[in-house]
């Protein structure tokens, strides 16, 4: 089987990761102790991608749980799915990173990284044919951002030909935990551009907006946000976990989605979004799902696709849906909004259909878009970074851990390059495209 090893790092990464395992265990009929209690052969056909079958007939996630302080790990162990994970795969320090990227990347994280890589290698050895890794982390803190990107570069070194995809939670000024988030995020994006193959960008601001606007929650907590993220993660990985046709492997998804290697940051969305408890009062058609899915209100990244252009799009539909309906609806969206799709990538929208609907829904659609409008997100972080960096505010926390100002300048200019690359391809025409191909 083509296995995927899942790594969750830092508090946010671990909380999002646990919600992901909760969601997909439900879909594969695996209970809290790892026993199979499902009813369909489809649930088990590709279960080995994410789970290892132990001799006791117990399914164990191929997951490594990492943090620089023990608190998060204790919470996972005491949570509903705490017994599911292999005890040896919890790797944690005692000191914490104090929201400092340099501590996660260069000092505290560097001390723990060898123990983490030992566990990763052990997991890789128990795989038949490893296809790659997925990492859940946030970009605003110390451990998920700093140590998460250190882990990324170590995996890239040790497994140069495997795919690495990240689910990265991007900080937002409206929902800010710490004042140095723009530094941590810019330094992380600098690493993601170079070392990740695919990055699904998830944005707290967009998640909060969804909770208020669509789900009508008055006081959403992290549990609500993580639930939304797990819906998207479950949708994005559907093709990897169940028998299907399109994008059945991480590499195939990348080949369809990434026209230029640096532009691998995706906007994700999910439909239907319904307030808790109202699902059972409504049924959806393929056309409604398609409409919702392309609506910026359903995007989990705070940028408006209408302000940019789609380079590529992948859509995963789930449930008892006819392929013909899906193709018709997707063609209609393209013809109605042709100006939003670049014309120099001819068949840039791909769709997949999986019979197995997510728990509690009759049908759903997950959206993955490679759109130039994601530069809004990077611009937001870059502007905040610049304001602080010009005054060298808070820099002593980073230089005190041995970092050099030069590294900040490099990260800043890499971010600016990324912005101008997105802009260049947004403005490009068919004639320009011929030049890109020649170069």
From Swiss-Prot:
<keyword id="KW-0493">Microtubule</keyword>
<feature type="binding site">
    <location>
        <position position="11"/>
    </location>
    <ligand>
        <name>GTP</name>
    </ligand>
</feature>
<dbReference type="InterPro" id="IPR023123">
    <property type="entry name" value="Tubulin_C"/>
</dbReference>
<protein>
    <recommendedName>
        <fullName>Tubulin beta chain</fullName>
    </recommendedName>
</protein>
<feature type="binding site">
    <location>
        <position position="138"/>
    </location>
    <ligand>
        <name>GTP</name>
    </ligand>
</feature>
<dbReference type="InterPro" id="IPR000217">
    <property type="entry name" value="Tubulin"/>
</dbReference>
<keyword id="KW-0963">Cytoplasm</keyword>
<comment type="function">
    <text>Tubulin is the major constituent of microtubules, a cylinder consisting of laterally associated linear protofilaments composed of alpha- and beta-tubulin heterodimers. Microtubules grow by the addition of GTP-tubulin dimers to the microtubule end, where a stabilizing cap forms. Below the cap, tubulin dimers are in GDP-bound state, owing to GTPase activity of alpha-tubulin.</text>
</comment>
<comment type="similarity">
    <text>Belongs to the tubulin family.</text>
</comment>
<comment type="subunit">
    <text>Dimer of alpha and beta chains. A typical microtubule is a hollow water-filled tube with an outer diameter of 25 nm and an inner diameter of 15 nM. Alpha-beta heterodimers associate head-to-tail to form protofilaments running lengthwise along the microtubule wall with the beta-tubulin subunit facing the microtubule plus end conferring a structural polarity. Microtubules usually have 13 protofilaments but different protofilament numbers can be found in some organisms and specialized cells.</text>
</comment>
<dbReference type="InterPro" id="IPR003008">
    <property type="entry name" value="Tubulin_FtsZ_GTPase"/>
</dbReference>
<keyword id="KW-0479">Metal-binding</keyword>
<dbReference type="Pfam" id="PF03953">
    <property type="entry name" value="Tubulin_C"/>
</dbReference>
<keyword id="KW-0342">GTP-binding</keyword>
<dbReference type="InterPro" id="IPR037103">
    <property type="entry name" value="Tubulin/FtsZ-like_C"/>
</dbReference>
<dbReference type="GO" id="GO:0046872">
    <property type="term" value="F:metal ion binding"/>
</dbReference>
<dbReference type="InterPro" id="IPR002453">
    <property type="entry name" value="Beta_tubulin"/>
</dbReference>
<dbReference type="InterPro" id="IPR017975">
    <property type="entry name" value="Tubulin_CS"/>
</dbReference>
<dbReference type="GO" id="GO:0005200">
    <property type="term" value="F:structural constituent of cytoskeleton"/>
</dbReference>
<feature type="binding site">
    <location>
        <position position="142"/>
    </location>
    <ligand>
        <name>GTP</name>
    </ligand>
</feature>
<dbReference type="InterPro" id="IPR008280">
    <property type="entry name" value="Tub_FtsZ_C"/>
</dbReference>
<feature type="binding site">
    <location>
        <position position="204"/>
    </location>
    <ligand>
        <name>GTP</name>
    </ligand>
</feature>
<dbReference type="GO" id="GO:0005525">
    <property type="term" value="F:GTP binding"/>
</dbReference>
<dbReference type="GO" id="GO:0005737">
    <property type="term" value="C:cytoplasm"/>
</dbReference>
<dbReference type="GO" id="GO:0007017">
    <property type="term" value="P:microtubule-based process"/>
</dbReference>
<dbReference type="InterPro" id="IPR036525">
    <property type="entry name" value="Tubulin/FtsZ_GTPase_sf"/>
</dbReference>
<dbReference type="InterPro" id="IPR013838">
    <property type="entry name" value="Beta-tubulin_BS"/>
</dbReference>
<dbReference type="Pfam" id="PF00091">
    <property type="entry name" value="Tubulin"/>
</dbReference>
<keyword id="KW-0206">Cytoskeleton</keyword>
<feature type="binding site">
    <location>
        <position position="226"/>
    </location>
    <ligand>
        <name>GTP</name>
    </ligand>
</feature>
<feature type="binding site">
    <location>
        <position position="144"/>
    </location>
    <ligand>
        <name>GTP</name>
    </ligand>
</feature>
<dbReference type="GO" id="GO:0003924">
    <property type="term" value="F:GTPase activity"/>
</dbReference>
<feature type="binding site">
    <location>
        <position position="69"/>
    </location>
    <ligand>
        <name>GTP</name>
    </ligand>
</feature>
<keyword id="KW-0547">Nucleotide-binding</keyword>
<keyword id="KW-0460">Magnesium</keyword>
<feature type="binding site">
    <location>
        <position position="69"/>
    </location>
    <ligand>
        <name>Mg(2+)</name>
    </ligand>
</feature>
<dbReference type="GO" id="GO:0005874">
    <property type="term" value="C:microtubule"/>
</dbReference>
<feature type="binding site">
    <location>
        <position position="143"/>
    </location>
    <ligand>
        <name>GTP</name>
    </ligand>
</feature>
<dbReference type="InterPro" id="IPR018316">
    <property type="entry name" value="Tubulin/FtsZ_2-layer-sand-dom"/>
</dbReference>
């Amino acid at each position: 089987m083509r296995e995927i090893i899942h790594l969750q790092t830092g508090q946010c990464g671990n909380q999002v990761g646990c919600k992901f395992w909760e969601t997909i265990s439900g879909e594969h009929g695996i209970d809290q102790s790892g026993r199979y209690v499902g009813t369909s052969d489809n649930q088990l056909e590709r279960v080995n991608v994410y789970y290892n079958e132990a001799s006791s007939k117990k399914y164990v996630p191929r997951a490594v749980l990492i943090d620089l302080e023990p608190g998060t790990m204790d919470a996972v162990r005491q949570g509903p799915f705490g017994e599911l994970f292999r005890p040896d795969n919890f790797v944690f320090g005692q000191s914490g990173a104090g929201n400092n990227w340099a501590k996660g990347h260069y000092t505290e994280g560097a001390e723990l990284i060898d123990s983490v890589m030992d566990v990763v290698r052990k997991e890789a050895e128990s795989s038949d044919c490893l296809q790659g890794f997925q990492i859940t982390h946030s970009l605003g803190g110390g451990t998920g951002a700093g140590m998460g990107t250190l882990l990324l570069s170590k995996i890239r070194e040790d497994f140069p030909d495997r795919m690495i995809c990240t689910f990265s939670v991007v900080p937002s000024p409206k929902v800010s935990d710490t004042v140095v988030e723009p530094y941590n995020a810019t330094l992380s994006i600098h690493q993601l551009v170079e070392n990740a193959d695919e990055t699904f960008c998830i944005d707290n601001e967009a998640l909060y907006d969804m909770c208020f606007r669509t789900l009508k929650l008055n006081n959403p907590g992290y549990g609500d946000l993580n639930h939304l993220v797990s819906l998207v993660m479950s949708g994005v990985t559907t093709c990897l976990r169940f028998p299907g046709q399109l994008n059945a492997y991480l590499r195939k998804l990348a080949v369809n989605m990434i026209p230029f290697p640096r532009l691998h940051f995706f906007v994700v969305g999910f439909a239907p979004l319904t307030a808790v408890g109202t699902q059972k009062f409504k049924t959806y058609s393929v056309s409604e799902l398609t409409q919702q899915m392309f609506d910026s209100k359903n995007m989990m990244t705070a940028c408006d696709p209408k302000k940019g252009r789609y380079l590529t799009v992948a859509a995963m539909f789930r449930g008892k849906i006819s392929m013909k309906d899906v193709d018709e609806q997707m063609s209609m969206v393209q013809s109605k909004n042709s100006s939003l799709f670049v014309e120099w990538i001819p068949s840039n929208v791909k769709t997949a259909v999986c019979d197995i609907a997510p728990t509690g829904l009759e049908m759903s659609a997950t959206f993955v878009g490679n759109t130039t409008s994601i530069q809004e997100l990077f611009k937001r972080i870059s502007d905040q970074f610049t304001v602080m960096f010009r005054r060298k505010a808070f820099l002593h926390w980073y230089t005190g851990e041995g970092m050099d100002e030069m590294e900040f300048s490099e990260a800043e200019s890499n971010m600016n390059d990324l912005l101008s690359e997105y802009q260049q391809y947004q403005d490009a025409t068919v004639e320009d495209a011929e030049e890109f191909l020649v170069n």
